[in-house]
């Protein structure tokens, strides 16, 4: 991985994506075939923002494509229908959700959003012929013999080293502390972060402190950490609803260092829960910045905001999964009901990206991390929260 210093040179991907779709709009809407794409993930509870941004991104993009005539795959034109299932961050419900998708004949599913859910649905996906795009980081999901999962975002073990390196070189960070919810997802991210920090030569002053995910008073958890005065406090795998509570507690206890996480966050939730105390909070953002957005991305944000009354920066990343699915199917129409064909196409797949300026392309990556191409390529945007909105700290990439 590397930090990209010139955004004008890097991460400028083609804007041709769905432009041609309007030319395909010939027939009446109702005459198009239907293509169902599934979502199984969390849309309720403390982590709801993660899955909600998925669903809203998919629905906004599907409506837009349908409005412009549908999507041409092979010799057919399809209207896209998004079928959703809230797994409530429960692995058993995630399995039920994936089984529902199989019953409906759906072969391509976005989600789940967390490690437990993504791991639990693997047997169903492999048995029923489903390719799924989790937002979860266990490498065993993406390394052989596994082959049905495609990582839909930048992993914490990819973004963490980049964030720590940047803060070490640019903010003088020398000491670091970690705190995580006592669940497999954040604990795994904490362990990856600790390994990355050690590799960079940072002094780890705390890495065993945990809390229950339903905690609302974080003072007892954070008091011993704040007393150690680390330069950087990492909230490993923190859910969007808990981030402002942790930040507020740390600041009210007198913590003056930097605070970061490798998970995506919601600016509105931070503003409502922590206000100006959240200023300077560093997180992984969506895969877009005002400087690199294409007109198509601006239009997506406009449509999303009009449809739902607000926009979540995380949707800058979540917009990509549906696009990758549809463009890969367009590249090999046989894959529409045969995931083996989809897998064959991934190794050489390349398509214009409608969401950022420039001439780079959508492609599958992951060879370095997984030994096979089982990850979507998106810009790695690292944000700093400031006065109600995210500002770009730096942009990187993963191979």
Segments and roles (model prediction):
Residues 2-3, 8, 12-15, 29-399:
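Extracytosolic ligand-binding ectodomains
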